């Protein structure tokens, strides 16, 4: 309330139409599988929630999209719509193996670098891990990406493989974690930015729990916006303490000297 005038509060769907910043350091593409009703049929569909971190370290919900695997131009249209909202560059895109998204992201933002998505990898391990151990597993996966040095990573990775040593886990490790060491060309501070997963896991779980894949369905994306809750959970907060952010920014300036971060 301002001077007796009641102020309108933006809804989640309205926030996803606002003007964007020119640059996002990282955009997390968080995938959930939900049921969507089309006519008389209910089919499973992948939903991607895009969350960006701006150059000041603030997280912003960008939008929610329903993947269209048979439309090779769909993601290009999505990225072009983001550019129309003011977005000019994405430094890192944390995404699963969605080939259409990666291909078209490179067209829209030629300098983008793709990184693993922990919110995609962790649930693949959850399927074959007891419920009480899933949180511990998520922490260990995060640790694989955020060791101080490549030598520390190798030690951590060896221990991870020893602990998760059944045939299924070994197959998952080979398929999804075999290239993790390559990310150690980036400093630990930048990797903390790329794989700061706690807030992303919260969003992933919020959609997963709200739309149980065996019990619920939606008719359109507006129902997802409604379930996401308050905009305060997705806008205007930092995921990093001041010292953490200073170290991240210091390393980004060295990696991207032509970008004005400050």
Where do the model's predicted regions map?
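RNase H-like nuclease fold core
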Residues: 2-92, 199-200
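Short alpha-helical patches at protein termini and domain edges
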Residues: 7, 84, 99-103, 107, ...
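Acidic/histidine-rich, metal-coordinating catalytic segments
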Residues: 30, 90-100, 120
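Switch/connector loops and helix/strand junctions flanking conserved nucleotide-binding motifs
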Residues: 35-37, 100-104, 124-128
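Intrinsic-disorder/low-complexity, polar/charged segments
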Residues: 54, 68-74, 146-153, 217-221
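Amphipathic, well-packed alpha-helical segments that form the structural scaffold of globular domains
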Residues: 79-80, 204, 208
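Extended amphipathic alpha-helical interaction segments
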Residues: 106-203, 210-215, 227-228, 233-236
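Basic, amphipathic alpha-helical segments enriched in Lys/Arg and hydrophobic/aromatic residues
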Residues: 207-262
